[in-house]
């Protein structure tokens, strides 16, 4: 019941996805051959959210893996949990997208998309009551961004009422892998605004900082970064997979976090993050978790929540703890930092409590915030986009795949609109009513005081 179908695309998406499955397998006591070796009934009670039980008693992840080149898939398959996945669910091309969004979205990706959709349909038919999809991808490359957004829009057409959650790795401000990242990211955001329900925004630089500053790793690898992401991903869905005192699912999350349909880009955080040697010197308490979780250094994307205001936020606590204490701590945060929350949404922090902590911890918490400061990410990408687009640099790679310049212009203005929407709600106060006519009409029917 309430299954989630996991889809990973491109090199980044597949590497994050692989780490995520390692974490989920460990939490549910599934060994690398797909057999259950755990010690608690709770691990099996709702294991079907992420796993399908095969006739021979093996548990098979509900995962679809796609890429336009075979490399990452091969290393996944030979990795620790490569044998748990259903072999038919690996869908890959041979050509690669060459960091070109147009190749992923219009040419190479479009050729492969039907075979991916076949696998998605097959998995969805296996579900009792599919709750939604979670997609892991990056926005800077070609496959995860171009083909990822193509798949999201196709799934949207076919399953319009299911939740669509994405874990999207944005290009980092200082660390760039590809010159054309701003193009790919802007074209992707243009799609995500329309077709995704909830986007968890991640970026490598913020993750590097956490590894470096907090976890004290001198040379963090992508494996370390992806481990951080997977901890968060597992935290977002723990309520679905384990019993809890205050449960939540993808839809409840969306209802509580999204005040306006386009503003669904969230920053995420995780606590406790401690360096490997120092765990045994701290006892974890709810106040400590809360404090670390709201700390701006803990956010997994390079936007500073102190530069904006929270429209809404959600906290998921895991472990044995008192719900009363959780509620008190959450109120405490809101009261002490009231200037960082918009006052026209009272009680805008939701908390959920799940009894089972992650492997190796007594308690932990996951934070998801809808903050107006996320516009910093979009603004930064947009500036880089404009600088190149003004000179039409690199455009021939995209127009050569049949794209039109118009599409770039549209994507650019959609992203700029998004930035100004965030800004408008950051500046809005409870008593002044401006012209919000671009929002759904009928939401504010009071006289304007401009």
From Swiss-Prot:
Record-linked Pfam families: Tubulin (PF00091), Tubulin_C (PF03953)
Cofactor(s) listed: Mg(2+)
Region (Disordered): 420-450
GO cellular component: cytoplasm; microtubule
Heme keyword on record: no
Skewed-composition ranges (Acidic residues): 429-450
GO biological process: microtubule-based process
Quaternary structure annotation from Swiss-Prot or TrEMBL: Dimer of alpha and beta chains. A typical microtubule is a hollow water-filled tube with an outer diameter of 25 nm and an inner diameter of 15 nM. Alpha-beta heterodimers associate head-to-tail to form protofilaments running lengthwise along the microtubule wall with the beta-tubulin subunit facing the microtubule plus end conferring a structural polarity. Microtubules usually have 13 protofilaments but different protofilament numbers can be found in some organisms and specialized cells.
Function comment: Tubulin is the major constituent of microtubules, a cylinder consisting of laterally associated linear protofilaments composed of alpha- and beta-tubulin heterodimers. Microtubules grow by the addition of GTP-tubulin dimers to the microtubule end, where a stabilizing cap forms. Below the cap, tubulin dimers are in GDP-bound state, owing to GTPase activity of alpha-tubulin.
Protein name as it appears in the record: Tubulin beta-2 chain
Biological source species: Arabidopsis thaliana (Mouse-ear cress)
UniProt lineage: Eukaryota, Viridiplantae, Streptophyta, Embryophyta, Tracheophyta
């Amino acid at each position: 019941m309430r299954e989630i179908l996991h889809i990973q695309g491109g090199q980044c998406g597949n590497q994050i996805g692989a780490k995520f499955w390692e974490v989920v397998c460990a939490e549910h006591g599934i060994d690398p051959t797909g057999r259950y070796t755990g010690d608690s009934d709770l691990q099996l009670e709702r294991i079907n959210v992420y796993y399908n039980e095969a006739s021979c008693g093996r548990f098979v992840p509900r995962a679809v893996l796609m890429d336009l080149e075979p490399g990452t898939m091969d290393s996944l398959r030979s990795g620790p949990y490569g044998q748990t996945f259903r072999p038919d669910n690996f869908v890959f091309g041979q050509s690669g997208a060459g960091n070109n969004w147009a190749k992923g979205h219009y040419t190479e990706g479009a050729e492969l998309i039907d075979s991916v959709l076949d696998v998605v349909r097959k998995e969805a038919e296996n579900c009792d009551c599919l709750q939604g999809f979670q997609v892991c991808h990056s926005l800077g490359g070609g496959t995860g961004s171009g083909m990822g957004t193509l798949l999201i829009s196709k799934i949207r057409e076919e399953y319009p009422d299911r939740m669509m959650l994405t874990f999207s790795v944005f290009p980092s401000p200082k660390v760039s892998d590809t010159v054309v990242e701003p193009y790919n990211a802007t074209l992707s955001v243009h799609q995500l605004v329309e077709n995704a329900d909830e986007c968890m925004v991640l970026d490598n630089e913020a993750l590097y900082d956490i590894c470096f500053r907090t976890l004290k790793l001198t040379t963090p690898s992508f494996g370390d970064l992806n481990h951080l992401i997977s901890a968060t991903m597992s935290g977002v869905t723990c309520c679905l997979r384990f019993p809890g005192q205050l449960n939540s699912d993808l839809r409840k999350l969306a209802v509580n976090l999204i005040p306006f349909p386009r503003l669904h880009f969230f920053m995420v955080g995780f606590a406790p993050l401690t360096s490997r040697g120092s765990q045994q010197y701290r006892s974890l308490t709810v106040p400590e978790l809360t404090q670390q979780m709201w700390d701006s250094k803990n956010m997994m994307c390079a936007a500073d929540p102190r530069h904006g205001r929270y429209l809404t936020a959600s906290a998921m606590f895991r472990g044995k703890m008192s719900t009363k204490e959780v509620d008190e701590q959450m109120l405490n945060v809101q009261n002490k930092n009231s200037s960082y929350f918009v006052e026209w949404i009272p009680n805008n922090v939701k908390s959920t409590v799940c009894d089972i902590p992650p492997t190796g911890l007594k308690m932990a918490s996951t934070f998801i915030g809808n903050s107006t400061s996320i516009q910093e990410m979009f603004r930064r990408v947009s500036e880089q986009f404009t600088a190149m687009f003004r000179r039409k640099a690199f455009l021939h790679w995209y127009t050569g795949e049949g794209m039109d310049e118009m599409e770039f212009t549209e994507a650019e203005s959609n992203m700029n609109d998004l930035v100004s929407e965030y800004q408008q709600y950051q500046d809005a106060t409870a008593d002044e009513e401006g012209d919000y006519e671009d929002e759904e009409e009928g939401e504010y029917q009071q006289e304007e005081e401009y």
